[in-house]
Amino acid sequence: MAPVYEGMASHVQVFSPHTLQSSAFCSVKKLKVEPSSNWDMTGYGSHSKLCSQSKNIPPSQPASTTVSTSLPIPNPSLPYEQTIIFPGSTGHIVVTSASSTSVTGQVLGGPHNLMRRSTVSLLDTYQKCGLKRKSEEIENTSSVQIIEEHPPMIQNNASGATVATATTSTATSKNSGSNSEGDYQLVQHEVLCSMTNTYEVLEFLGRGTFGQVVKCWKRGTNEIVAIKILKNHPSYARQGQIEVSILARLSTESADDYNFVRAYECFQHKNHTCLVFEMLEQNLYDFLKQNKFSPLPLKYIRPVLQQVATALMKLKSLGLIHADLKPENIMLVDPSRQPYRVKVIDFGSASHVSKAVCSTYLQSRYYRAPEIILGLPFCEAIDMWSLGCVIAELFLGWPLYPGASEYDQIRYISQTQGLPAEYLLSAGTKTTRFFNRDTDSPYPLWRLKTPDDHEAETGIKSKEARKYIFNCLDDMAQVSMTTDLEGSDMLVEKADRREFIDLLKKMLTIDADKRITPIETLNHPFVTMTHLLDFPHSTHVKSCFQNMEICKRRVNMYDTVNQSKTPFITHVAPSTSTNLTMTFNNQLTTVHNQPSAASMAAVAQRSMPLQTGTAQICARPDPFQQALIVCPPGFQGLQASPSKHAGYSVRMENAVPIVTQAPGAQPLQIQPGLLAQAWPGGAQQILLPPAWQQLTGVATHTSVQHAAVIPETMAGTQQLADWRNTHAHGSHYNPIMQQPTLLTGHVTLPAAQPLNVGVAHVMRQQPTSTTSSRKSKQHQPSMRNVSTCEVTSSQSTSSPQRSKRVKENTPPRCAMVHSSPACSTSVTCGWGDVASSTTRERQRQTIVIPDTPSPTVSVITISSDTDEEEEQKHAPTSTVSKQRKNVISCVTVHDSPYSDSSSNTSPYSVQQRTGHNGTNTLDTKGALENHCTGNPRTIIVPPLKTQASEVLVECDSLGPAVSTGHHSSSFKCKSSSTVTSTSGHSSGSSSGAIAYRQQRPGPHFQQQQPLNLSQAQPHMATDRTGSHRRQQAYITPTMAQAPYTFPHNSPSHGTVHPHLAAAAHLPTQPHLYTYTAPTALGSTGTVAHLVASQGSARHTVQHTAYPASIVHQVPVSMGPRVLPSPTIHPSQYPAQFAHQTYISASPASTVYTGYPLSPAKVNQYPYI
């Protein structure tokens, strides 16, 4: 054993054990801590690398430690590990090994009142006792001394566990475990016991004013954890309680998604609060030290900045201030496996913004915000200042403002950035410590004291610790310019540095009210890398995009899903029998992230036996999993279809876990025996196998109104852009998916036919508040023409689901994708409120979905519920102008440069046709209108998986390409299917330019989009009449796509964006981009760049008008090198997963389609 006790020396003495190289206590140096700094623990020893451990934390298990029987033990079946917190007055606990019979646990003194809480979600700093930071002062004379001793032990013969129950010859305090400073007296291999787990102390990791951190082994597992043992000194008791309360609040959030360190439990040991955290690898300060404090390239700073800004965004949304952000408190998770994956640690100084006190000592000095130094009121913005100092230190390799005192700190800031504003200095309570007011001037101004004046007043000598002295922050761009870059790479580096300095200046704004926020930081071009799109062929740019892959969300966010009040409402009835077989791949038995079962409570109603357990936690992570959600008959809003059978049974071949999006909990398992029963016949059921994890988190269905996600009050009073920015989806590499909603519609399913359900997710922007309120009220009886999905971007590294980010100005209408089984089948379906029919009478339309496992086809009949379709079907042209705002813009593509069938040579003329023989048609030649007042919307078309065949999609043909001068009009589209059209136009190859269009008033018409989801086979377009035929684009869905969205907020860009054709936008409205990566050499793929055009309508290609709720969803097929602009490279992002088909829900119906259960193989070299 190696007990630890506090000596009185001013340095650390080390008595090495027998194995010197394995000791965690060697090579520690003098600890320098600033006086009265709560958490200014700095520096690490040379052996600072910590072992990483498995992130799969099993559920809590009841401890077999003998404890007083009056203590209640928490239920081990709860989804989170439970915590027992003993009040500080209860004395201490003497613990034994797991099965020791020689010693019994006793609780000494104090009542037995216990507080149980859930897992906490952050790890505080793993700081080694050692390596001083430059210019830090120390006044604490205590030190740590390690002595090799062998105290009396109790050996358990049965289990072999050893517990040290006696102590050393050193004197201890009356607390029986603490010294005079309140630090716990550590004993190596000592056992720390919570109510659920037992931990053995392995190494001493570090200590600070908060206490100390030890590396422990969780007995019975192979997990290594870090336990933070807080001091029990009265002066730290209050802050310890605050830290525990903040960790308890953060325990409800996703630590991985928001880049917090996960904490497992909290317990009391010998009157000391112990916090158990996951073990991380290395902090950024050690990382810099390991690299000899060399500057870090911007391509590595960017992912660190993005992840920490995401953490600050979540803290800001919770009203929390970290208050001690610095390189030591940013930990690398696993540098070898996940380069530059970081998490924020140490919430010992954190507080709620409402409880912030101006005189409170906060933040380490180098990273201390001016408002703290001057004694001004502060808020979460102090963390953004600290983050700016951190990224500047990473860029320089040395602290930007390494002040040895607060005077030096404000002096450095003022010399580089200028004096704080006069109103700030006048309001500061500590201003007079560093500034003098010039009373001789008629306008008294503040003047910084000279170093001599300050030394004369305080006796503190000013020091110069800066490595770089800048007259302004812009001078930083000239530091450490790399010389090994040539050509475009050098231009990329210079552009990157300009954006970095621009962001840094906004983060280091002295006035906190004007300082950039975390969400704005995540939308800054430096983070989104929009400025790098000008250099698509640069290897440096490719490397930048690859490094940002680590910033993707691990799972889709579940917090915004819970805001959805609309459940999945779709009437499903079997067509020929009462049996429906659900077939799943055996691959679907893996749970990548263990979520909470709480969000599934609304779905797991009667007739839905669900069982929690741990059997479904598999060792092999499988991102290609699906989940089955079975909604019981008791689900509200599921009326039976009167013409169909009333019920059916469900059989499953193997158990499939239901995965929701709350990490750390257990999955739900549907047992086959329970699902094989026949359900009651009073109502129909929904079987929604969500096609990847975006659909697995189901919101609590407290209301069954067919309404949009955003409540009426919010839609009418709050700008949607602000509402969306309050969530974490300001990050475009860690996007958030809200729960989509399938709208009402009767769908007929055949017997014994495997099916999956997908929903095309769309997003809307806030229209005028009156418009939103009016539309919400107008469609309140049946919100069938309102999409209830609010989505920014959906991306998950644990799922092959690729993101679709859609930007719109008004609530969107759902787009519908149709499919046909053979060349002779012509399928039509109503779009929006317009029923597609051969005659003016309402009739059912069929959608035939061939499924690979079955030779038969599924016929889905879709009909409307009310007379709205009929009324709108006969609506005159005059009503269209009111409805055109509900139309979503789409991508257009040519068949070939010479295949334009229009007799009008003007590229901006509009040709209009009406439907004929039940076929919805649309023909626009890309009108550019100035007078249109309709708000444009865009939808990013989802790509198809490789198992799906070529898709025939009717799309608007654009005349001569609206070019920005970067590209020609000879972009070829590859297609493997031969298609014949009655107009005689071959669509084997097509060319065109992507355009942004708005709606234009015009005659009432409809559109058809037949889609073939079966194997590749020729198709024939439906017969049409009219002098002009619309061009047809054929999609060969064989490319995997890694879509990213890049907001473009730069006001300096002109109306026409250089990257895209005819892009008109406002500075406040970001552009959206989608990147693709080819899966193999010569493979074809789908790329869609859809940008909501803002501002000038002259650069906007517009639709002719058609009824509300029609959505154009047009994929564009292009080769690997064929993109709308040569400035956009097709392979900025390496593809990880193949595409699957997205299906959107229309107001009157819902389309189902089959998903391939196995992902397509991706080329190892996506950039070839």
Swiss-Prot record:
Pfam families xrefs: Pkinase
Residue span of region Transcriptional corepression: 97-230
Ranges for region Interaction with TP53 and TP73: 812-907
Modified residues annotated as Phosphothreonine in this record: T141, T252, T273, T482, T517, T566, T660
Region SUMO interaction motifs (SIM), annotated ranges: 856-880
Region (Required for localization to nuclear speckles): 845-952
GO cellular component term of the entry, any: PML body
Positions of region (Interaction with UBE2I): 845-879
Protein name: Homeodomain-interacting protein kinase 2
Lineage: Eukaryota, Metazoa, Chordata, Craniata, Vertebrata
